[in-house]
Amino acid sequence: MLLCSLTLMLLWMVASGLECDTKEVCLGSPGIPGTPGSHGLPGRDGRDGIKGDPGPPGPMGPPGGMPGLPGRDGMTGAPGLPGERGEKGEPGERGPPGFPAYLDEELQGTLHEIRHQVLQSQGVLILQGSMLEVGEKVFSTNGQSLNFDAIKELCARAGGHIAAPRSPEENEAITSIVKKHNTYAYLGLAEGPTAGDFYYLDGAPVNYTNWYPGEPRGRGKEKCVEIYTDGQWNDKNCLQYRLAICEF
């Protein structure tokens, strides 16, 4: 039995030697572990990792200190849009009465200058024959020829009326203006509801006339009156163009 065991061991050893020769490596059984080595040097820093999720908010900090001083005023801004107009206020109290006009030397001086200028203007117009004074009336013309309604409106805008003689003196003054312009002129008269009855434009009946012989004879168809260059009157329709003479 012992012999058999020795034989088997010998065969195993021979086989093991042949295996070493063939592979040039001999496989032995693991040895006893050695002692641990010393710590090596620290490795290099690794690359930055991926950005992580935000963390939760931290707790509220303590209150700050006292507020600082106010800053300086800024630059003035651009003006805004105008606002809506407010309601009209109540009238104020009535002031004390002023001084009478005759006590105001400056006003009196101004009025005196105005009167002087008016008199000068009247003198120039009188010399030109475009204005004549008779009593408290002034007769004037601008030389235009218009129909009756247009003359009436023209004189009203100037603050007067169509010339209407109420005396021989006034009729003569109007006649002299007509002669100067060598034309006829309308008078401030109009026929009433009854043919042949004429009135002043204020509705008063005519108290002075100087009709041409046989006039008026329009029989209600000629409502206006014209004056000839000899001062006599004739009834006429109101659409003709005649010299505009106003009285003031």
From Swiss-Prot:
<keyword id="KW-0732">Signal</keyword>
<feature type="compositionally biased region" description="Basic and acidic residues">
    <location>
        <begin position="42"/>
        <end position="51"/>
    </location>
</feature>
<dbReference type="GO" id="GO:0007585">
    <property type="term" value="P:respiratory gaseous exchange by respiratory system"/>
</dbReference>
<dbReference type="GO" id="GO:0005581">
    <property type="term" value="C:collagen trimer"/>
</dbReference>
<dbReference type="GO" id="GO:0005771">
    <property type="term" value="C:multivesicular body"/>
</dbReference>
<dbReference type="GO" id="GO:0005615">
    <property type="term" value="C:extracellular space"/>
</dbReference>
<feature type="compositionally biased region" description="Basic and acidic residues">
    <location>
        <begin position="84"/>
        <end position="93"/>
    </location>
</feature>
<keyword id="KW-0325">Glycoprotein</keyword>
<dbReference type="InterPro" id="IPR033990">
    <property type="entry name" value="Collectin_CTLD"/>
</dbReference>
<feature type="glycosylation site" description="N-linked (GlcNAc...) asparagine">
    <location>
        <position position="207"/>
    </location>
</feature>
<dbReference type="InterPro" id="IPR016187">
    <property type="entry name" value="CTDL_fold"/>
</dbReference>
<comment type="subunit">
    <text>Oligomeric complex of 6 set of homotrimers.</text>
</comment>
<dbReference type="GO" id="GO:0046872">
    <property type="term" value="F:metal ion binding"/>
</dbReference>
<dbReference type="Pfam" id="PF00059">
    <property type="entry name" value="Lectin_C"/>
</dbReference>
<keyword id="KW-0176">Collagen</keyword>
<feature type="region of interest" description="Disordered">
    <location>
        <begin position="29"/>
        <end position="103"/>
    </location>
</feature>
<feature type="domain" description="C-type lectin">
    <location>
        <begin position="127"/>
        <end position="247"/>
    </location>
</feature>
<dbReference type="InterPro" id="IPR016186">
    <property type="entry name" value="C-type_lectin-like/link_sf"/>
</dbReference>
<feature type="binding site">
    <location>
        <position position="235"/>
    </location>
    <ligand>
        <name>Ca(2+)</name>
    </ligand>
</feature>
<feature type="binding site">
    <location>
        <position position="234"/>
    </location>
    <ligand>
        <name>Ca(2+)</name>
    </ligand>
</feature>
<protein>
    <recommendedName>
        <fullName>Pulmonary surfactant-associated protein A</fullName>
    </recommendedName>
</protein>
<keyword id="KW-0430">Lectin</keyword>
<feature type="compositionally biased region" description="Low complexity">
    <location>
        <begin position="69"/>
        <end position="82"/>
    </location>
</feature>
<keyword id="KW-1015">Disulfide bond</keyword>
<feature type="compositionally biased region" description="Pro residues">
    <location>
        <begin position="54"/>
        <end position="65"/>
    </location>
</feature>
<feature type="disulfide bond">
    <location>
        <begin position="224"/>
        <end position="238"/>
    </location>
</feature>
<keyword id="KW-0767">Surface film</keyword>
<dbReference type="InterPro" id="IPR001304">
    <property type="entry name" value="C-type_lectin-like"/>
</dbReference>
<feature type="domain" description="Collagen-like">
    <location>
        <begin position="28"/>
        <end position="100"/>
    </location>
</feature>
<keyword id="KW-0964">Secreted</keyword>
<dbReference type="InterPro" id="IPR051077">
    <property type="entry name" value="Ca-dependent_lectin"/>
</dbReference>
<keyword id="KW-0272">Extracellular matrix</keyword>
<feature type="signal peptide">
    <location>
        <begin position="1"/>
        <end position="17"/>
    </location>
</feature>
<feature type="binding site">
    <location>
        <position position="217"/>
    </location>
    <ligand>
        <name>Ca(2+)</name>
    </ligand>
</feature>
<keyword id="KW-0106">Calcium</keyword>
<comment type="similarity">
    <text>Belongs to the SFTPA family.</text>
</comment>
<keyword id="KW-0305">Gaseous exchange</keyword>
<dbReference type="InterPro" id="IPR018378">
    <property type="entry name" value="C-type_lectin_CS"/>
</dbReference>
<keyword id="KW-0479">Metal-binding</keyword>
<feature type="binding site">
    <location>
        <position position="215"/>
    </location>
    <ligand>
        <name>Ca(2+)</name>
    </ligand>
</feature>
<feature type="disulfide bond">
    <location>
        <begin position="155"/>
        <end position="246"/>
    </location>
</feature>
<comment type="function">
    <text>In presence of calcium ions, it binds to surfactant phospholipids and contributes to lower the surface tension at the air-liquid interface in the alveoli of the mammalian lung and is essential for normal respiration. Enhances the expression of MYO18A/SP-R210 on alveolar macrophages.</text>
</comment>
